[in-house]
């Protein structure tokens, strides 16, 4: 018998192997009335691309837009890294920003653990996003900058961190979700997303998606 996919987890875009005792989030967060500040181990999946409709399409093994996930070996599932994160909200607006070590890790060895900070070798990675919620809709615009370039081979595989070069690049994105129908506990929402990376030699430099959920 032929099957569509080898593993049930594949239907949820979960393709990574099991990792024992890997740290996803570990740190200290201080909370004010309209703001949060966090320092410690964290990954991008905690704070970005987690809105209601988008989370149905992402947050598995890809986790975030491919213009970022396929371009940099960052703290994206199943990897994490040392992070300084904050967000501020007022009215329907929220601004959030995260500063990470340029490479994510999930091991427990001396040279592979999420507590490493090596800006000269791994680079620095920063993500910023502005969000607006109004009348059943959520709208987002953001940008990410990495201080090192990770090329790809002819097979599309990303180079190792030791082979990266000192060349900054950025990715930007806009996306929105809007409820178009609601009755009792059921609703339908439409989604549109677009993103580009400034370096066309990265794993993915342009991405777009339309969806209904």
Q: What does each of the following model-derived ranges do?
A:
Residues 166-167, 196-207:
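Solvent-exposed loop/turn segments connecting transmembrane beta-strands
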Residues 171, 175-195:
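Surface-exposed extracellular loop regions of Gram-negative outer-membrane beta-barrel proteins
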Residues 103-175:
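Surface-exposed beta-loop-beta
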Residues 33-34, 89-92, 133-139, 181-188:
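Short loop/turn motifs that connect adjacent beta-strands in outer-membrane beta-barrel proteins
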Residues 1, 42-44, 100-102, 144-148, ...:
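Outer-membrane beta-barrel pore domains and translocons
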Residues 2-11, 60-68, 103-112, 151-158, ...:
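Flexible, solvent-exposed coil segments and beta strand-coil junctions
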Residues 37-39, 86, 95-97, 139-143, ...:
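Membrane-embedded beta-strand positions of outer-membrane beta-barrel proteins
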Residues 1-102, 132, 202-209:
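Outer membrane beta-barrel
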């Amino acid at each position: 018998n032929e099957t569509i996919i080898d593993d049930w987890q594949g239907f949820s875009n979960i393709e990574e192997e099991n990792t024992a005792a890997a740290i996803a989030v570990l740190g200290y967060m201080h909370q004010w009335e309209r703001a949060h500040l966090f320092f410690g181990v964290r990954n991008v999946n905690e704070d970005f691309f987690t809105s209601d409709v988008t989370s149905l399409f992402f947050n598995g093994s890809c986790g975030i837009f491919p213009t970022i996930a396929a371009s940099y070996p960052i703290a994206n599932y199943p990897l994490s890294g040392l992070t300084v994160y904050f967000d501020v909200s007022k009215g329907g607006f929220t601004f959030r920003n995260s500063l990470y070590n340029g490479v994510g890790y999930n091991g427990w060895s001396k040279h592979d653990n999420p507590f490493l900070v090596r800006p000269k070798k791994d680079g620095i990675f920063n993500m910023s996003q502005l969000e607006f919620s109004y009348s059943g809709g959520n709208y987002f615009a953001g940008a990410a900058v990495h201080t090192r370039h990770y090329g790809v081979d002819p097979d599309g595989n990303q180079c190792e961190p030791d082979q990266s070069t000192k060349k900054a690049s950025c990715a930007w994105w806009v996306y929105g979700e809007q409820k178009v129908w609601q009755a009792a506990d059921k609703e339908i929402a439409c989604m549109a997303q677009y993103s580009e990376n400034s370096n066309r030699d990265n794993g993915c430099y342009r991405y777009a998606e339309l969806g209904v959920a």
